[in-house]
Amino acid sequence: MKFYIDDLPVLFPYPKIYPEQYNYMCDIKKTLDVGGNSILEMPSGTGKTVSLLSLTIAYQMHYPEHRKIIYCSRTMSEIEKALVELENLMDYRTKELGYQEDFRGLGLTSRKNLCLHPEVSKERKGTVVDEKCRRMTNGQAKRKLEEDPEANVELCEYHENLYNIEVEDYLPKGVFSFEKLLKYCEEKTLCPYFIVRRMISLCNIIIYSYHYLLDPKIAERVSNEVSKDSIVIFDEAHNIDNVCIESLSLDLTTDALRRATRGANALDERISEVRKVDSQKLQDEYEKLVQGLHSADILTDQEEPFVETPVLPQDLLTEAIPGNIRRAEHFVSFLKRLIEYLKTRMKVLHVISETPKSFLQHLKQLTFIERKPLRFCSERLSLLVRTLEVTEVEDFTALKDIATFATLISTYEEGFLLIIEPYEIENAAVPNPIMRFTCLDASIAIKPVFERFSSVIITSGTISPLDMYPRMLNFKTVLQKSYAMTLAKKSFLPMIITKGSDQVAISSRFEIRNDPSIVRNYGSMLVEFAKITPDGMVVFFPSYLYMESIVSMWQTMGILDEVWKHKLILVETPDAQETSLALETYRKACSNGRGAILLSVARGKVSEGIDFDHQYGRTVLMIGIPFQYTESRILKARLEFMRENYRIRENDFLSFDAMRHAAQCLGRVLRGKDDYGVMVLADRRFSRKRSQLPKWIAQGLSDADLNLSTDMAISNTKQFLRTMAQPTDPKDQEGVSVWSYEDLIKHQNSRKDQGGFIENENKEGEQDEDEDEDIEMQ
């Protein structure tokens, strides 16, 4: 379908379009025209990705600036999905225009997913793959071979073959999904990872994970060549604040400190060896540092530093590395002193939390280590590892963490906290101390993105309440909007169950969650829904701990035996492989008619990235409100920080956080307008939180369904499922929830008549101002 938004011709790869897709595109165009940031909440399963791509690529191709698009998503499967959508869109554009546009679209993921080297790709741990790859591809190994052809150095042929080709000729033009990229590179014996890395500046659109833009350790290497007028899109961005915080946080355990000591000793031995054989090497390095050169000046283009800079670009120091860590021996003994100090700090019996400033003061009093040399730790370690030509870099990963920790704690003060806990997990009998350097302010990591790029679009299916994000991430928006879902026939039934059939109020509140009457009520609710739900049913709990305790109580009450009669029961566990197996079995049981129930956790893998479309999810049951564990020291510190700096009250944030996760769980069952499902929120506290649900869920929640008992909810569900079982005529949806080209033109004309819009010749103008939608123009 081809239509115009103002003067912009948009090619949409489907013959029909949803009204909300059209409104969404109009708002994205407004954001791009005005420049600035917007937050848009689009209902689940209404083709958000394809709308985003259709509009932004039309915008890119139509206007002469050809602004690059950076599309960030969370998981590997979402990135792959976006690439496939992009491929379809570009095929459609080629067909409609009659020629192939000069266009490149690529996706980037970790080495582990893209490596083709027969030995390295066998490794299961991502960090090991990274280190082995670096060892075979860094410029040092290549130089060594050139100097001494007999040297025992292994190079990666996939990477070496890239030197024979010009960067723009690595790949033909077009869009490459991961599958297509790997296949092409396998045939040509080329390295897919480095192809994408080096072609980023040549791409029209690059699709990758948030970390490549938000985590300074990676962003500096990957995204520094991206132009400032790029359009940045954060898709599935309901958790973006957590990603920002993780990118500047670090945990150290006693085991890591032990390994770091071993690493420092190994470095010492290596320095002694080099002193005997080639002492000039160390002298050269020392002289370079005296001249005030940095790793950026010393490393060649093809080399990556051993320790990536963990701080944001604007916080880097440009002065020379301090004198007391220039000599290799001095630096290693400096690291050893630091590690020994950290070991003594770990010997605690109760939780300690302190600011970076007080930690550095105490460190200076005891070990005479100044703040300045600490800031250069990661850079100095990179240079030393390079000078010593260390090949077994895996031995030094713990040392890398120590250097990163030193650089972070000496660079940042405001919005950071150091917490030392004697027990890594609650109720542990054996002390296993852990030192957490944690970022409390989500805006620090994302600030460079807002400062650097003119348009940033943050979007998701569950991002309500919208005004929380600009406050948490400290930025201004030009547009905030939540879209309702247009339906010819109600295809999802949200309900809030506040009491069991015996009228006892149900809740997962900590004080009463193990009360037998509440557990029994939750159990009988599960049995009743299992009886009437066709095929698949997904149940979410607030935490693994609560799920384990309630399931074992159900077992003793005989509730699970009752459920078995109707459906299989499968459980999500913290182990990724077990969960994958459970999901596979669940899908099999749903497809062959046995039906199944999947018990999972609100912040787990299942709730975040797995879709239960059609028969795989007909009912989703949310047992209890998924609040965070409020006794966590880090959470307490973060809440206090937000209250003092951003005036966000503790309860507001906790409630917002719980509701975005609950909405995320509910959205799993509705993956399109032809899909249907029942959404049950089972906790009496939900009835007060209706306003915090996304607009499209709240619109389907009638006043009568806010305070139901189990038996009333069951009778509503029976009626709803009977209605949905009737064959539907697709014609009923036309013009209401699905628009043909004619409907779209009709809508544009009616808007034009209302808004007195000046018509371009032969072009359909559009001005979309829905009074009823919560829109903010600043």
Curated annotation (Swiss-Prot):
Tell me the GO BP annotations in alphabetical order.
nucleotide-excision repair; positive regulation of mitotic recombination; regulation of mitotic recombination; transcription by RNA polymerase II; transcription initiation at RNA polymerase II promoter
Q: What class of enzyme is it?
A: isomerase
* Compartments in which it is found: Nucleus
- What is catalyzed by this enzyme? Couples ATP hydrolysis with the unwinding of duplex DNA at the replication fork by translocating in the 5'-3' direction. This creates two antiparallel DNA single strands (ssDNA). The leading ssDNA polymer is the template for DNA polymerase III holoenzyme which synthesizes a continuous strand; ATP + H2O = ADP + phosphate + H(+)
Q: How is the cofactor bound?
A: Binds 1 [4Fe-4S] cluster.
Q: Where is this region: Disordered?
A: 750-778
One GO cellular-component annotation of the UniProt record comes to: transcription factor TFIIH core complex
For the ligand (ATP), the binding residues are 42-49
Q: What cofactors does this protein use?
A: [4Fe-4S] cluster; Mg(2+)
Q: Where is the Helicase ATP-binding domain?
A: 7-285
Q: What does this protein do?
A: ATP-dependent 5'-3' DNA helicase. Component of the general transcription and DNA repair factor IIH (TFIIH) core complex, which is involved in general and transcription-coupled nucleotide excision repair (NER) of damaged DNA and, when complexed to TFIIK, in RNA transcription by RNA polymerase II. In NER, TFIIH acts by opening DNA around the lesion to allow the excision of the damaged oligonucleotide and its replacement by a new DNA fragment. The ATP-dependent helicase activity of XPD/RAD3 is required for DNA opening. In transcription, TFIIH has an essential role in transcription initiation.
Q: What is this protein called?
A: General transcription and DNA repair factor IIH helicase subunit XPD/RAD3
- The species this protein belongs to is Saccharomyces cerevisiae (strain ATCC 204508 / S288c) (Baker's yeast)
